[in-house]
A protein has these predicted regions:
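General small-molecule cofactor/ligand-binding pocket signal
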Residues: 32-34, 88-92, 143-145
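Small/aliphatic-rich secondary-structure junction motif
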Residues: 2-56
């Protein structure tokens, strides 16, 4: 079985990691832990006043944070899952919803797991919902894990 676990380092994402870690997956399953990172704002003419290395340094910092997020999830899974489960980590630059869907399709995932931030209507309108986009457009099963109160 191929399981794609999308993480972003948030408490909701941590809940999805814990959900994956507590399940008895079929022997030989592969869990791919994916995180996407992107600049919080596109470079605009106003940004030209910033130092030349600003966006490069920001990209390096975002990559480091993404790597730490993936590594932390993999360590949690390694500690709790059967040794027959294969673990892989990937960090990709770009919008999360697109990258999750593209990776799931190209890898032929059987299941995608994502955490839900539980945004209300106004927040969803402003920020968008990665989990909603994945549920709506994925070609495989999707599980949205909610943070327990």
């Amino acid at each position: 079985m191929k399981i794609l676990l999308a993480v972003d380092g948030s408490p909701c994402s941590d809940a999805a990691v814990e959900e994956v870690a507590r399940r008895p997956w079929p022997e030989g399953s592969t869990i791919k832990v994916l995180t996407a990172y992107e600049l919080p704002m596109p470079p605009t003419p106003e940004a030209w006043a910033l130092p030349l290395d600003y966006f490069k340094d920001l990209d390096v910092a975002l990559q480091k944070q993404a790597r730490n997020t993936v590594d932390r999830a993999i360590q949690t899974l390694k500690a709790k899952l059967d040794k027959s489960i294969l673990l892989d980590g990937v960090l990709l630059p770009g919008p999360p919803r697109t990258l999750i869907l593209d990776e799931a399709e190209s890898w032929q995932a059987d299941l995608i797991l994502v955490g839900s931030h539980g945004y209300r209507a106004w927040e969803r309108l402003l920020l968008g919902s990665v989990s909603q986009a994945v549920v709506s457009h994925a070609k495989c099963s999707v599980e949205v894990v909610r943070l327990r109160d």
